[in-house]
């Protein structure tokens, strides 16, 4: 596209021609207009809300070049591939290029051949890059994953702090846009200050992603729980996050033995193997990615239908960001967290052994305290009987509804139960043994277990021994968890976790206090809706289609895979599942009708339109 042609086009024409959309989503147009008028912006928008378009459209309408600062090579490659497929001249500059490739790309940039250049923050202050930008007309800088600039953020990158130094060395200051999906108020304030944004237009569209269903389970056998879900979603792709490399290897190996299409990703693999495994997942050659949190930031794969956390993450920010990798196309997606008490201990170990964040010991201690508070909030999320979505939104400073109708708590049946007797027994048992043992010993004592450990510790002589023998152990564990949430007790996160009393415990032990709590009516705490699912070879994305439409959708998916292999691009870059579903429902029969489908722009139609029309014409 020639510069003159771009500048004659309106934002709506650019939106339709290059991206295939007829209208902007919530908040997009406001940020586009601000950047076009020369105002800095700060956009906090949930994953899948279309942050990229907020700077890509101004980039095509403004003169000169837009630089996009991006933290990950995979994200840059993904975005550039998507833009090139849409007919936009874009490139990336990072360490994946050889010296010759880098110089060639930089030369093309100086000649004005690109409208959008993605660059790693580490490259900004290199002499070669600084020299090159002096002769470029840089009209805008967009900072992607802007939370990386904040030490309050979950992915702090010191290299992001160099962005303002780079801007100061440009001949003229360009307009600056900062974008992220997950940022508390502290992080937002940091972004504004550390990027020196000038009276920015701020947009926080909200953190709620209504297409995500949230589920928390506390299964006895995590692998069995995960496999049960996977068996019901054979046609879908998803991510399983584990806390440790060992977990990744174990889960991946077990799934391979069961015949699943699975690969893995963690920092212990070679660069080449990580790259190959990531591409296998992105190109749909493998359906399941088992990974540590080293995988995912910047992955733009739109057709991920589920994320399973095999272990509880360290904080709500990480949890919600990783959940955001499912359902980016706006179609229904599921997010499942499998909790066990060991997860808290593992995370606490990571906090205690985290790298020195500051030369000042006091600052390091404060950072660790902050991380421990975040871990506590994350743990309480796993225990709550309230709406999970509302818990998440309140954590990020928003207020939702007490009932979302799309989380495991809202879909389960609860009753309010007086648990005073059990709560007092738990607290009394802990006090009588002088707060020396962990949850398993305490619960086994109350249940009257006759084990070697109970006898060794003389817990069979505790006055509360066997007092709650008729209560299911899982219910006792629920009550103990609730006592933590209400701060009657806490469980240390040492190698051998110990149950300790807090001052508030005396309110129940020594006074006439009562304790009521919500408890699931059924012993199985998995929602009924989840139990009624059956095996299907059709993607969950197509669940609302008729049988005929679902069959057409699967044919379109097969064609997309063929074209992806032929053009060597990820399938979702050709067309998203959402676009294919609209095709299956509306069955366009000519170019005009095909261009009316959301996500089909002129450039995409020229490349792929005819094969899809031919597929739709088959009966």
Which functions belong to the PLM regions below?
Residues 2-18, 22, 26, 30-52, ...:
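Helicase motor core with emphasis on the C-terminal RecA-like subdomain
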Residues 366-396:
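Short, charged low-complexity linear segments at domain edges
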